[in-house]
Amino acid sequence: MTSTRQAGEATEASVRWRAVLLAAVAACAACGLVYELALLTLAASLNGGGIVATSLIVAGYIAALGAGALLIKPLLAHAAIAFIAVEAVLGIIGGLSAAALYAAFAFLDELDGSTLVLAVGTALIGGLVGAEVPLLMTLLQRGRVAGAADAGRTLANLNAADYLGALVGGLAWPFLLLPQLGMIRGAAVTGIVNLAAAGVVSIFLLRHVVSGRQLVTALCALAAALGLIATLLVHSHDIETTGRQQLYADPIIAYRHSAYQEIVVTRRGDDLRLYLDGGLQFCTRDEYRYTESLVYPAVSDGARSVLVLGGGDGLAARELLRQPGIEQIVQVELDPAVIELARTTLRDVNAGSLDNPRVHVVIDDAMSWLRGAAVPPAGFDAVIVDLRDPDTPVLGRLYSTEFYALAARALAPGGLMVVQAGSPYSTPTAFWRIISTIRSAGYAVTPYHVHVPTFGDWGFALARLTDIAPTPAVPSTAPALRFLDQQVLEAATVFSGDIRPRTLDPSTLDNPHIVEDMRHGWD
């Protein structure tokens, strides 16, 4: 009877410890994925990170998982100590990873230096995460928690906990850690969770496997690692602020990290600049050249309603409100953080345009809105497409045949669409790709370009759903403009031999050529 009771108690303890261990497995898996997502996010924010960079990072991480599983084999005979060491090192490296990469981007002059930090961080984190499962499997098969005969069931439980933890990490990063804490603090908090999980495993499970002195040493090491990450957490704001300022020549006066992008506003004297993910969007010294060239060719004298896709800074809306006869402006912007900055920090620049009763602001993805929007029965007299350069697949779809076909449904008969199309000099293939893509959606297109000192030679596309390409013209009712007039606009349609027109295959959702064009253009 006594032996039966003892066996039952042992079984109950085994189940309890197994649950604790599997919970720790899930926590460690969540932490491992968060570390990699943090590196991916930071690389994308600071370096643009397209599909090629993302694919290489993910592939490198997966390869490192396998390498870690192989390299840990000689230490399986000392699985308990090895597990504690792996978790301590992983917690430190993972917790510090975002701060280290941020510092590398900020303080290393050469891109190769920060790329090396990213590659090393990916390899180390992947290798350490890959070592976890073999170590845990070995511990589970030592008879105190599970028997060797249950190896298949044990492996299934480990995999289930591992994948469930990865799911939790994948959801926690974009919906909780990144928006609430930011990249550096989010990674640091994850490191603390990682080390705490290792501590739980050490206290409740490994005390039966290692000596008392070894356990105390391990716990002290974990505590020291926790102290290091906690110190980073306390000073993370100073680190981030100092590092961020290193990336910009002028003092930063506003910063947001939204669910979509990093937004920075700088000011030096009267020169105010807006950056999205490190890319300059406008400079107040010359933005009027860009904005006037974008807006006025698209609005005829009789235009009443205008759709603006992108342009959340409010500059296009500012100019539209100056044009007599405009009664309605629908402004579609993906990122509410951009709208918030436009209504506060940028209010003097855009003249409070987004708070004008004639402007209706919609927070939505431009393509999604076009697919499901309640377009006025008569359509819009003009559509202004003022979107970021298509240097990622997400942005590339907004420069596709399918996108322009959707925009056509929003145009009134005879209405005009204008698209900012990048630089015909710096990114000529991308520029002419956009022109060809718009034509593939059934438009007749007239390309034109102007000089914007901050950007250099910058191009646009004026399009209409007719067989005859529209002639760019400044409306006769236009207000007094600082830069654009009919003579300037006529000259803008002339392209020199080194940037002469060419016909290319259109960029589509299936084949987003434009993204690769942008990458090669700026390279």
Curated annotation (Swiss-Prot):
It catalyses: S-adenosyl 3-(methylsulfanyl)propylamine + putrescine = S-methyl-5'-thioadenosine + spermidine + H(+). It is found in: Cell membrane. SUPFAM superfamilies: S-adenosyl-L-methionine-dependent methyltransferases. Keywords: Cell membrane, Membrane, Polyamine biosynthesis, Spermidine biosynthesis, Transferase, Transmembrane, Transmembrane helix. Its EC number is 2.5.1.16. S-methyl-5'-thioadenosine binds at Q261, E333, D365, A366. It is a multi-pass membrane protein. GO terms for molecular function: spermidine synthase activity; thermospermine synthase activity. GO terms for biological process: polyamine biosynthetic process; spermidine biosynthetic process. The keyword Protease does not apply. Residues 203-478 are annotated as: Spermidine synthase. It holds the Pfam family Spermine_synth. Spermidine binds at D313. PROSITE patterns: PABS_1, PABS_2. The active site is at D386 (proton acceptor). Catalyzes the irreversible transfer of a propylamine group from the amino donor S-adenosylmethioninamine (decarboxy-AdoMet) to putrescine (1,4-diaminobutane) to yield spermidine. Was identified as a high-confidence drug target. Homodimer or homotetramer. This is Polyamine aminopropyltransferase. It comes from Mycobacterium tuberculosis (strain ATCC 25618 / H37Rv).
